[in-house]
Curated annotation (Swiss-Prot):
Belongs to the bacterial ribosomal protein bL21 family. The lineage of its organism: Bacteria, Pseudomonadati, Pseudomonadota, Gammaproteobacteria, Enterobacterales. It comes from Yersinia pestis. This protein binds to 23S rRNA in the presence of protein L20. GO terms for biological process: translation. This is Large ribosomal subunit protein bL21. Part of the 50S ribosomal subunit. Contacts protein L20. One of its GO terms (cellular component) is ribosome. One of its GO terms (molecular function) is structural constituent of ribosome. The gene is rplU. InterPro entries: bL21-like, bL21-like_sf, Ribosomal_bL21, Ribosomal_bL21_CS. PROSITE patterns: RIBOSOMAL_L21.
Amino acid sequence: MYAVFQSGGKQHRVSEGQTIRLEKLDIATGETIEFDQVLMIANGEEINIGAPLVDGGKIKAEIIAHGRGEKIKIVKFRRRKHYRKQQGHRQWFTDVKITGISA
């Protein structure tokens, strides 16, 4: 059984027991969360596709950890003008473990 849901402006395909990394959620570690923006649920041969959302579809998950991703560097450079600019960025994330999928 797997499902596709939307969180943080992105769509994720998950199955029960899977751990995924989402955009930062303001929920404490160890708490549970319920995602209700479920786009599709597949259970064997039975596939339930929403238009746009599945009625009554819910995904339960547990917050495992919060953190920051690896640093990326943004570099701006103009040739012959002695112009160089460098900036770094680390994106916040939340790791969640999918505990249940229901339609």
